[in-house]
């Protein structure tokens, strides 16, 4: 997280923890980063409020919150992807956040329609390509919409449509272009698959590195994870063979 986001996180945590006299705050989170742990520790050091963490996958936490109902000890739910926020809203798990302080530091487009949630960070769903096959100049104007073109027939790699990241990408297309356009776009996208969807985001990047596909759709931060070497030599070597492209930059 950037320094600005760290300060924002601590402010929000303080506000959402309730009373300034609260002795502890219970957080259900699907995030699993060391940086978050440091933030919680800093919060406790600054406020004296203990942070209790329940960590699991978003789906499991959502079901737990539903089953606990009004008796849930959770004060804050931290998840990833707007799709999970939508599910939580459908389940009626959120209540409106009334805070002029939060309203002043979090832009309206990064808050729920009725202030039932706020965004702390954004993820980028981008394209990966082999620079030995394509130059930066060749792809600089590429958009998400272009991916359904016959030019990319049998050249795309992407994980299953069951994945929430892909569902959110489709949702963004519907918001921008409407359902009819997006349906035709999705059909073209499927026709351009280089292989049957399989594996996680890193598997798509590896497919490009190995020459199984020309373009992969995946979240940007996975390349950083691969290049860190923490996931083994195979992923490190694959990460070195690809480059990131942020599509639709002319929009």
Report the location of each language-model feature.
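Positively charged n-region of N-terminal signal peptides that target proteins for export
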Residues: 1-6
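Bacterial N-terminal signal peptides
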Residues: 7-17
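Early extracytoplasmic/lumenal segment of secretory-pathway proteins
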Residues: 22-87
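Residues embedded in well-ordered beta-strands
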Residues: 26, 126-128, 243
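Extracytoplasmic ligand-binding site segments that recognize negatively charged/polar headgroups
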Residues: 30, 34, 73-212, 223-229
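Generic structural signal for residues in well-ordered beta-strands
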Residues: 51-53, 156, 242-244
């Amino acid at each position: 997280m950037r320094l600005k986001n760290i300060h924002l996180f601590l402010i929000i945590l303080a506000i959402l923890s309730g009373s300034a006299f609260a002795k502890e705050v219970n957080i259900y989170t699907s995030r699993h980063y060391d940086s978050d742990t440091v933030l919680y520790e800093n919060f406790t050091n600054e406020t004296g409020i203990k942070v209790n963490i329940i960590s699991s996958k978003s789906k499991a936490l959502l079901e737990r919150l539903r089953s606990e109902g009004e008796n849930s000890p959770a004060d804050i739910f931290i998840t990833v992807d707007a799709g999970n926020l939508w599910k939580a809203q459908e389940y009626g798990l959120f209540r409106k956040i009334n805070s002029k302080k939060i309203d002043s530091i979090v832009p309206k487009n990064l808050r729920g329609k009725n202030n039932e949630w706020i965004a702390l960070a954004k993820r980028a769903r981008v394209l990966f390509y082999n620079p030995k096959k394509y130059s930066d100049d060749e792809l600089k104007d590429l958009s998400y919409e272009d991916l359904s073109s016959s030019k990319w027939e049998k050249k795309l790699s992407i994980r299953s449509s069951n994945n929430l990241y892909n569902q959110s990408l489709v949702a963004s297309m519907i918001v921008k272009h409407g359902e009819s356009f997006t349906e035709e776009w999705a059909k073209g996208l499927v026709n351009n698959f280089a292989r049957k969807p399989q594996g996680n985001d890193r598997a798509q990047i590896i497919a490009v590195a190995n020459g199984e596909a020309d373009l992969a759709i995946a979240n940007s931060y996975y390349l950083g994870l691969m290049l860190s070497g923490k996931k083994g030599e195979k992923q490190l070597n694959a990460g070195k063979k690809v480059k990131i492209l942020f599509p639709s930059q002319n929009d």
